[in-house]
Amino acid sequence: METLSFEFPAGQPPKGRALVGVVGSGDLEVLLEPGQPGKLSIQVVTSVNGASLRWKHLFERMFDGQTPPALSIDIHDFGATPGVVRLRLEQGFEEIGHD
């Protein structure tokens, strides 16, 4: 198991929270909670050691050219593919957008 941390510039925190996905069977769980204004913090606990660069590039592609909401995101990964990671994050962002 490996724990990774990432930070990105962000806007204001949302009001909502979201929990998407399920840990197990090659999937992941993503918990999104309001964070500190101006900062998006991501912590990844993954079963795949040595994948820090892959995670970094995935997040950079997702947030390039946009200002995400200020969130604290916890990801519990059990070997999910980058496509599944992005899908779950997008589901979480949509969830917190609904009041």
Curated annotation (Swiss-Prot):
Record's keyword annotation contains Cytoplasm: yes
Coiled coil: none
Post-translational modification: Covalently binds the prosthetic group of malonate decarboxylase.
Signal peptide residue numbers: none
Record-level GO cellular component terms: cytoplasm
Primary location class: cytoplasm
Sorted UniProt keywords: Cytoplasm, Phosphoprotein
GO molecular function terms listed in the Swiss-Prot or TrEMBL record: acyl carrier activity
Modified sites of kind O-(phosphoribosyl dephospho-coenzyme A)serine: 25
Keyword Isomerase set for record: no
Top-level lineage group: Bacteria
Subcellular location: Cytoplasm
Entry-linked NCBIfam families: malonate_delta (TIGR03130), PRK01220.1 (NF002293)
Family according to the record: Belongs to the MdcC family.
Function statement: Subunit of malonate decarboxylase, it is an acyl carrier protein to which acetyl and malonyl thioester residues are bound via a 2'-(5''-phosphoribosyl)-3'-dephospho-CoA prosthetic group and turn over during the catalytic mechanism.
Protein name (Swiss-Prot/TrEMBL): Malonate decarboxylase acyl carrier protein
Gene: mdcC
